[in-house]
Amino acid sequence: TEDWRFRMVTAPKGDFAGVPLNAEGRKIANEWDAAKDQASSDHCKAYGAPAIMREPSRFHITWVDDNTLKIETDAGNQIRLLHFGGAVPPGTKPSLQGYSIASWQLALGGRAGRGGQGQPGGAAQRGGSLKVMTTNLTSGYLRRNGVPYSDKTTVTEYYDLLRESDGEQWLIVKTIVEDPQYLTEPFITSTNLKKEADGSKWKPEPCEVR
């Protein structure tokens, strides 16, 4: 897959190719201590919302209710909640997955279903993207080898569902990470996820420091 040496294995310290780090971000990445992370009780720094969709993981996506979509990951055993409408509730504490607000970006002629105002009962139909804005994050890693993001980070995602002529379904996730503390410009990735026939390979595992 693309970015194999970052997604499938832990790259060496100082290998942050492709990430637009500023001087402060590079300094922190170059000081990464794998042994210190291993000894820490927090092994989930690379599993936050800015990075989790790039993990070599399976994703289980279900509706909690008409206005809340849940994404579960087997890598790191994480849960993301995507809230349709509204704003971040006052007093919400920052967290690894932050607070995500979702909306349908409909193509011409599209129709909103669940998450659409006044139209519960079905997913978005006939084209368009799911847009997700995530804030209220704690700091963590963009990559497992200590490439940092700060608690000032915001994440914008676009989810597009594609169906091949042979019936295979793909979820394309475009992720835009913006961090005024450690990045000189947005860090943009695109991840292709293929739908499996069933959940037989689903195997949640705890966060790892590799």
Spans of features found by a protein language model:
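PEST-like low-complexity, intrinsically disordered acidic/proline/serine-rich tracts
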Residues: 1-210
